[in-house]
Amino acid sequence: MTHPLIPDLLHLAIPIAENLGLEVVDIVFQTNKRPPVLRVDIRNLAGDTGLEDCEQMSRALETALDSQEILPGAYVLEISSPGISRQLSSEREFQSFKGFPVIVTGQDSQGKPQEWRGKLQGRDEQSIYLNQKGRSLTIDRTTVISVRLDERRSNQ
């Protein structure tokens, strides 16, 4: 379940990221830790996301969070890049990584775990499309648990 502060945090973080030429990929507020941890994953729209991007976003977001007083009490702010092994979820990510090697995890018609590997061709409301060595594969989205980049094959 998403923390109730996430919409407010996104509303605050997205314009800050855009000002810096960045995109907010994900926000997670971990209240089970003491102090709570606010993790914001960002991506540089113009190239590789570096330490400088994380530092700039951290300074700007921390200032805004402190002035808005959205988070009660002490917290830890973590800004990071999601990395190549992350799970794809948004339509923008599926568009950005079209042609990249992915691993689709799901289950077959009997409910047994199954894994498909191939180059991402796209997705629509019903299916995810892969290319496996020149052969098209259509996977029903109702059977899919996750789609993530295949870091072992992305450097090839």
From Swiss-Prot:
Required for maturation of 30S ribosomal subunits. Gene3D superfamilies: RimP-like superfamily, N-terminal. Keywords: Cytoplasm, Ribosome biogenesis. Belongs to the RimP family. It is found in: Cytoplasm. It comes from Microcystis aeruginosa (strain NIES-843 / IAM M-2473). GO terms for biological process: ribosomal small subunit assembly; translation. Its main location: cytoplasm. GO terms for cellular component: cytosol. It comes from the Bacteria. This is Ribosome maturation factor RimP.
